[in-house]
Amino acid sequence: MAGGRATRMGGVVKPLLEVCGEPMIMRVVGEIRNLCNRIILVYSDHTSRVVDLCMGPMGSVECVKGVGGYVEDLKLALNLVSLPALVVPADMPFIDPVILEGFLLKALLTPEPVVNLVDASRGPVGVTLFKEREGSWADVVVDGGYKLLDVDTWSDYEEAVRICRDIMVVGWAHR
């Protein structure tokens, strides 16, 4: 999901903000690529600049223009794919495939048709597994630390930049 208006950040195109030298959306797609058969990126008029990445650097990513707000765009995306479907926001620069794999295993065993990933300290992060297009939901709580940082404010972005700097200082590059 990459269609948000980023009102808390003055309307910046968040998916294109760089963290560790590359746009956040590139980092997210790179980390989920091996977990998904098909990746669809839903964008909006506000975030239409991400289309340039869909045509090249992100590889086999289908870009679809959303129809409005988050709920409408989510419905659009879910109608384009077979289920189960994993929904991931474009503004989680450190998303970890190991955490996602653990979440998916737990979510698939959960009886509810919609399962949300919730970080123990940050709360809901916007990652959801849809086994059906609607219905009751459950939460899977994990302690993801910085790997589940969801950039919603400039303060979050500054934290991401700090984390990246700290990672580089110790000589460990994420990815």
Predicted regions and their residues:
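Short, structured coil segments at secondary-structure junctions
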Residues: 12, 35, 57-59, 81
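Conserved beta-strand termini and adjacent loop/short-helix elements that scaffold enzyme active sites
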Residues: 42-44, 64-67, 117, 141-143
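Conserved core of the sugar-phosphate nucleotidyltransferase
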Residues: 93-175
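Conserved beta-loop-beta/alpha segment of the NTase-like Rossmann-fold superfamily
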Residues: 51, 59-125
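Acidic helix N-cap motif at the loop->helix transition within catalytic regions
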Residues: 48-54
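N-terminal glycine-rich phosphate-binding loop and ensuing alpha1 helix
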Residues: 1-48, 98-101
